[in-house]
Amino acid sequence: MNLNIKVRGQGKALVFLHGWGFDHKVWLNLVDALEQKYTLYLVDLPGFGLSPLMDWPHFKTDLLKHLPAHFAVVGWSMGGLFASRLALEIPERTTHLFNVASSPRFIKEENWPGVEPLVFDNFLRNLVTNPQQTISEFVGLQLQNQNYEYRDQILPDPVSLEAGLTILADWDLREQLYHFKKPTTYLFGRLDAITPRATMAVMQKNYPSFNYIMFSKAAHMPFLSHKEEFLTILESLLK
């Protein structure tokens, strides 16, 4: 069984990778504005939506079979880890890396902002004991009253959810990013309860060549809460 990828539009390739607990439908609100200029690849990440659970090598191989020689990639939250790793491993095919409410390392460490390890461990424990309630609360935290209907999403099974959390806990791409030379942008929401705004200050110091944008009134989903501003930024940086 292969990855579920929806392809829309025409023009330069633009790959969208969603966050934990969601699937490709989270991006549908942007399609009408972009499909006249770009070919959009809306990907269900492994274990989410209609894509089967698979490891990184299989995901990468399957995805690249569907993509043209060159593409820009947009990753939101956990999808930013996938987007970054893809760009880091095949920079010759990546034109732009564009991460939203994401971080190369999600867990808090000394001199690095992120999710407290204890909070993360408790979340994982709750997911095992009560997956439905746990993911509902997590989705509510991300949406924060945004105009978005989660009921259309396919609820992932607990194994897939736990696999995604393992990626969030274990992947650390900070060192590799030091050597990444392609155009890169990180967007943050000042009100984000998941990816702390302090991440931006640390990244600006460590990766001064990247572009950074802070949405002062956005939380974890600026592409929904500030759609027009997000689209303007995206298109201006892709020119």
Where are each of the predicted segments found?
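Conserved alpha/beta-hydrolase "acid-adjacent" motif
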Residues: 193-199
